[in-house]
């Protein structure tokens, strides 16, 4: 396990290693101690849902990874915890529509991405 601290003594990063390969969830912390992000590693590659939080603890976003590339849904929220935007990735490229939402949850804008 590798750990890094802020100058105030608060844990900044916690990263598990197995046989010199990142294995498990790497966790980043804000200086106040709240979780900033978690990144799942398997076999040294990002694999699974990477999650982010605002300093107030509200969810900021989620991105799905397969073999170190974005693959699947990505969702982002405002600091108040309201969904702001969603999109999908395939092989690290945006796949389909980018959808922006109003604070009441209704669609505000849809951007069709043609590749």
What are the language-model segments listed below?
Residues 1-115:
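Glycine/tyrosine- and acidic-biased, solvent-exposed loop/turn segments at the edges of beta-strands
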């Amino acid at each position: 396990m590798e750990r890094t601290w802020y100058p105030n003594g608060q844990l900044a990063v916690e990263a598990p290693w197995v046989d010199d390969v990142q294995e498990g969830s790497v966790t980043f912390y804000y200086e106040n101690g709240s979780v900033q992000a978690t990144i799942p590693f398997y076999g040294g590659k990002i694999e699974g849902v990477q999650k982010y939080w605002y300093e107030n603890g509200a969810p900021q976003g989620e991105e799905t990874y397969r073999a170190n590339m974005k693959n699947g849904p990505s969702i982002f929220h405002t600091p108040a915890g309201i969904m702001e935007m969603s999109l999908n990735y395939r092989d690290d490229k945006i796949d389909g529509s980018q959808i922006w939402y109003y604070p009441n949850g209704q669609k505000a804008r849809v951007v069709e991405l043609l590749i």
